[in-house]
Amino acid sequence: MDSSCFLVYRIFRFRKRNKNISSSLSSSSPPSSLSQNWLHPVFLSFRGEDVRKGLLSHIQKEFQRNGITPFIDNEMKRGGSIGPELLQAIRGSKIAIILLSRNYGSSKWCLDELVEIMKCREELGQTVMTVFYDVDPSDVRKQKGDFGKVFKKTCVGRPEEMVQRWKQALTSAANILGEDSRNWENEADMIIKISKDVSDVLSFTPSKDFDEFVGIEAHTTEITSLLQLDLEEVRMIGIWGPAGIGKTTISRVLYNKLFHQFQLGAIIDNIKVRYPRPCHDEYSAKLQLQKELLSQMINQKDMVVPHLGVAQERLKDKKVLLVLDDVDGLVQLDAMAKDVQWFGLGSRIIVVTQDLKLLKAHGIKYIYKVDFPTSDEALEIFCMYAFGEKSPKVGFEQIARTVTTLAGKLPLGLRVMGSYLRRMSKQEWAKSIPRLRTSLDDDIESVLKFSYNSLAEQEKDLFLHITCFFRRERIETLEVFLAKKSVDMRQGLQILADKSLLSLNLGNIEMHNLLVQLGLDIVRKQSIHKPGKRQFLVDTEDICEVLTDDTGTRTLIGIDLELSGVIEGVINISERAFERMCNLQFLRFHHPYGDRCHDILYLPQGLSHISRKLRLLHWERYPLTCLPPKFNPEFLVKINMRDSMLEKLWDGNEPIRNLKWMDLSFCVNLKELPDFSTATNLQELRLINCLSLVELPSSIGNATNLLELDLIDCSSLVKLPSSIGNLTNLKKLFLNRCSSLVKLPSSFGNVTSLKELNLSGCSSLLEIPSSIGNIVNLKKVYADGCSSLVQLPSSIGNNTNLKELHLLNCSSLMECPSSMLNLTRLEDLNLSGCLSLVKLPSIGNVINLQSLYLSDCSSLMELPFTIENATNLDTLYLDGCSNLLELPSSIWNITNLQSLYLNGCSSLKELPSLVENAINLQSLSLMKCSSLVELPSSIWRISNLSYLDVSNCSSLLELNLVSHPVVPDSLILDAGDCESLVQRLDCFFQNPKIVLNFANCFKLNQEARDLIIQTSACRNAILPGEKVPAYFTYRATGDSLTVKLNQKYLLQSLRFKACLLLVEGQNKWPNWGMNLVTSREPDGHIVLYTPSSHLQGPLLMENLYTFEFELVVTSSEFVLEFRADRYKCALGRFDKFGVHVVWCHLDQYESKSPSCKPFWRDFPIVISNGQNILDAILKTPMPSINQ
């Protein structure tokens, strides 16, 4: 729904006012697994006869390899019910893993375990994981199939209450997304994945991990009080303090303790380092920040964020916990948390920074300052790292205090010094004291450098490489770049980690900002006044000086220039700038996060030389057409020259045997690629948007270790060489929008490791070679927009591992081969926009198909009767199939079908009967089915139906509601603009969330209109009308209405039903209102109402808008004003309206209407003089409504 809402009511209070309204809302927090003291890491629930000798033993072995000891009830004597020892084991396990196998339901013991596990999940926050072993999750969920047969036998003779508990537990367990063994080619890989998931959960536990953080509990307690988690408002707080004080640690501990109480959560760390400022394109920077936020928050890697409103759209109704760590600019906050309105009720945003002014500038009122620890706490912190306990070992008491004093109170310095002295003798400590005294001078940099000085030369060199060039790389990447160094990479990294100079996390190298600064300062001091004599250059001014004045030397091995740091002017690089840098190995001129700013680096006289020892060449927007003539790429590991003026890389056939990664994307003038004869180690080749590239060299076939080839938008590429068939290790091939590509070579079928093929937008492609059937590992094929493609090869049926096949807008495709019925693993088939497609083949064997898209297949006249065999199909799109005459009656036999879209099927006259067989159908859309006359009466028997859209069905006469006294719960019925609809409604709406839209249905009879208005459960509706019905107690003409109530109802929660008639308005806005709760007048407050999105649309005259809202009465007389807004701009005026009161009171949650309930469960809507009236309500005794 749009970020706006429907109406704003302004309420002015007169006369009576309660002046003693002040309190605070409190509620019990949901259970969190983080608050438990777990006895076991993992509890395994399983049916022994199915898994003990196979799956279970392999899981145990993998767990043992990873140091995980699960609780398994092998040794327990089993009786009629699970005993106290097993109950204790279940309740005392942090994670429960349920191995659901075919005979799991045959054991009462297993079923009782399952009930207890699901109870612990609900009450204790226990993490529950599921593994479906040779069993369909749907069979478990619905107790059907072989699983259901076994389960039913177990239920025979059991009490009904027990059976219902078992069923509920099985359904709940099956709804947990778990591993399905049938989806894994290799069971061992599945078990490794399970073990990793368990390890991740166990490693994300603060119960023991944070014991060494002295004073952490005091910090988190203070911050939790600022967060006020019991309030439903959205709140931002700041954590402020100097670098190295422990802000990041505190925020992580806090996040770990609280994240289970929120729907979504994320920690965005190192923001200052990863997204530095300033930059030339601030908007692109904001988009990238927001993409990072959403990718982590909703766990979707390839998020598309086209504008800065996406975060609000995706998160406005989600309760989130967000930690933004190391923020140093308002731009960063504007991109990720500009306003509390971006997030759903109850959300908490924690901003961690060193800049107090930044917090205040962003309007953050609640700020926690992290102070230095006391002397005793500092000693404890030091001892935790030096001795592994909070006090000194015997005999080390005095010397430990001395070192603590010298190291200062900064936690980072205490950690580094403690790690350095760990396991040293007292004599070694004593020898270190004099050096420490002379080098520290109360400066944390000296403390850190003291630890650095203790390293061997090789480890020092590795430390400087990382701080200056590789601090955000993965370990294996660093190993490749430094392969020629004599140091043992893994051993060196471990030494640095042991001394707390870096950390190794899931294969990534992480380093504290102060340690990075230490390394940069060490390098800077190698030659303060002559930067060309240093090992590394990272400072913009220093680099400019060296490149323009030819002052580089053989000492220099790395240059890293972030071009966004060049704020003014350009850099004119001398022709001989690199001539003296004969040992240069790493050269990086780059723009941050794709910021394609103006040209900054120029070579007016060209370039005569680049070091032959280069291992990394990363030069974006390189201004010349070729690299220097004498350039030798023999040692190159990675070359990235995106967005450059290159026409070719170099002359001749140079050896590139060490090359692993090549990226020449957006080199629009590139006509020639280098010879790949020696590129046997090349793994990735990216050539995106190389518009002048006509062909690939035949030598590409020698790159036999190539894993990914990306040729997106190479619009001049006519063909691929036949040698492409030699790339037997290729896994991904992207040819998107290669609009000149006519065909693929017949040798293409030899690329047998290929898993993903993207041909989308290859508008000239005439055919796909039949040899594609040989690629047995192929899982995804995308050929959207291949408008010249007439048919698919019949061999496509041999790709039995195919899961996704997209042929969207293949307008010439007339039919699909019958062999497609062999694609038994196919899950997603998209044929939308295939205008020439007349019919589908039998898809009876495609039993795993979940989504079928056939929208705008305007020539399609029928569906195959065998569609009923696609038993897992849950979504079917047939929108715009204007020639579709009928649906096969078998369609309702697809019991898993949840969504069916038939919008614009203008030839469809009726739906098949027996629609009630589609028991899981939730959404049925028939909008603009102009030939449809009536709905089958049995449609109202589908209890799960939640959305039915028959709007603009101009011929629809009857909904067949009369014979069905109860419609499905929570139904949204949209019958707007059904101009022929003549409907009697003789039914009862049970659920208060029902939404009805009969806008412009002017033939709707008066009985039906009265029933909709007067049914207490129907809270949201639009229906035709010219006056406000007499049902509404308070009615008025004008722009306001005064409500008078007896004083005894003060501080009661009242539900109001309103009816509004629009006298004028703008109808161009599809969504309108204002998503804001804000104080207006000193004496008044605003109440916000958000209706269903299905009632939003153009503002309509001659129609009545009815809805309900709730508020707390604080005065015996008040005025209501109604208006329609969009982003604070008035769009319409309501001239006639009425209000009817439904009584409620808060003390016992009772009412005269069964639909009425305490208002805060629906809306946080009451604000008065800056105070939340609800606070007072909860602590003020309520008079009974009947007094």
Swiss-Prot record:
GO terms for molecular function: ADP binding; ATP binding; NAD+ nucleosidase activity, cyclic ADP-ribose generating. Residues 217-478 form the NB-ARC domain. LRR repeats lie at residues 498-522, 611-633, 635-658, 660-679, 680-703, 704-727, 728-750, 752-775, 799-823, 824-849, 870-894, 895-918, 920-942, 953-974. Keywords: ATP-binding, Hydrolase, Leucine-rich repeat, NAD, Nucleotide-binding, Plant defense, Repeat. The active site is at E113. The keyword NAD applies. Residues 38-202 form the TIR domain. It comes from the Eukaryota. The keyword Hydrolase applies. Its EC number is 3.2.2.6. It catalyses: NAD(+) + H2O = ADP-D-ribose + nicotinamide + H(+). The TIR domain mediates NAD(+) hydrolase (NADase) activity. Self-association of TIR domains is required for NADase activity. TIR-NB-LRR receptor-like protein that contributes to disease resistance induced by the Pseudomonas syringae type III effector AvrB. Acts additively with RPM1 to generate a full disease resistance response to P.syringae expressing this type III effector. This is Disease resistance protein TAO1.
